[in-house]
Amino acid sequence: LYETTNKYFSFTFNKVKHFADCRKIVYFQSSGRNVRIATTHGNLLCYDKLSKIIKELPPNLFVQLHKSYIVNISFIVEYSANEVVMSDGVHIPISYSRKEDVHNFLRLNY
């Protein structure tokens, strides 16, 4: 269902195939199997697990901060030990179990 070709993330929702430019995806937020894709042009919806989605995204552009969030590091405007702030003002927590990996990733890629 998911693929990234030429930096596009594709997914099927309600039997319709959608394409989202990875460079315009701000973050993914899951609630159960519902995943909201926040983009610079509004929100999209798909059904899946973040653990599957993260494998399909450009690895140097996206990082999973929490069991419920994957973020595009291009849209992080500030980060601290416990959270990041996205360009749209949303504060996203960094889980304790991912904290060290996230900070190492951000040091290398941000």
Regions of interest found by a model, annotated:
Residues 1-87, 91-94:
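Conserved binding/recognition cores within well-folded domains
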